[in-house]
């Protein structure tokens, strides 16, 4: 049974200053084997509707491990609207312009209109208990800058998405004092995380705790001018059912 969830994230920021990086940033939870896995980063495939140099995802050894830009997958996905969040779901029957055997099942969300995405992948989908599931985030951090003062974000989160709902919450960052707190609210599930920001890149990493005792890690990235978007993941080795991806726009 799919459980509702609550995520609380507390991130210590080292400083507030412009981020001059112009490349793609991303991350994913650990793979469960050497065949069924994804990898987030800069897209490398330049064929058909696919373009290199964008936020991308690869499927293990599939297509020689070339990363496909997520934006080119979006038109083939089915959209599921839950509140203010549009989740795109995509499986082997999506009609992609390349062989679909082994593609698995994606649920992913675009943050605003930017080339910034978060979601999850599994080899079997919700109908078969999300085998080999991984969560991910990826986006273009060109022109990212971190402002002074307080910024807030409306968040959504993905965890074993079966079409019924997404996590909802908010993030508040006081960039004068260097602290960020966030929460994704559900029922019966608690996640807490803390970390620090690399001011040169806009990336953060740290620890996470599920249900008060299960220890994991958190990582993520601020994107855009004025830190207009944020995405990240919380992961738990040996307890991947708690792995969650999240993201949102600055209010």
Short names for language-model regions:
Residues 16-18:
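N-terminal signal peptide c-region/cleavage motif recognized by signal peptidases
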Residues 21-251:
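Mature soluble binding/inhibitory domains
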Residues 1-8:
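Bacterial N-terminal signal peptides that target proteins for export
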């Amino acid at each position: 049974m799919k459980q509702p969830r609550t995520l609380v994230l507390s991130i210590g920021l080292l400083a507030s200053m412009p981020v001059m990086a112009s490349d793609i940033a991303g991350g994913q939870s650990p793979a469960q084997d050497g065949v069924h896995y994804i990898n987030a980063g800069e897209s490398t495939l330049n064929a058909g509707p696919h373009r290199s140099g964008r936020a991308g995802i690869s499927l293990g050894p599939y297509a020689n491990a070339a990363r496909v830009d997520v934006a080119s997958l979006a038109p083939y996905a089915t959209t599921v609207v839950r509140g203010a969040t549009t989740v795109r779901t995509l499986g082997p029957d999506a009609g992609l312009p390349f062989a679909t055997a082994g593609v698995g099942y994606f649920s992913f969300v675009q943050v605003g209109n930017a080339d910034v995405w978060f979601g999850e992948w599994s080899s079997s989908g919700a109908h078969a208990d999300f085998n080999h599931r991984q969560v991910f985030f990826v986006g273009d951090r060109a022109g990212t800058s971190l402002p002074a003062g307080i910024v807030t974000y409306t968040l959504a989160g993905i965890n074993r998405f079966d079409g019924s709902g997404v996590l909802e919450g908010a993030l508040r960052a006081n960039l004068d004092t260097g602290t960020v707190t966030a929460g994704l609210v559900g029922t019966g599930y608690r996640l807490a995380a803390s970390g620090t920001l690399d001011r040169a890149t806009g990336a953060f990493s740290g620890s996470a705790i599920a249900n008060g005792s299960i220890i994991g890690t958190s990582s993520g990235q601020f994107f855009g001018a004025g830190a207009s978007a944020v995405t990240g993941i919380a992961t738990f080795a040996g307890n991947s059912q708690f792995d969650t991806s999240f993201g949102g726009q600055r209010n």
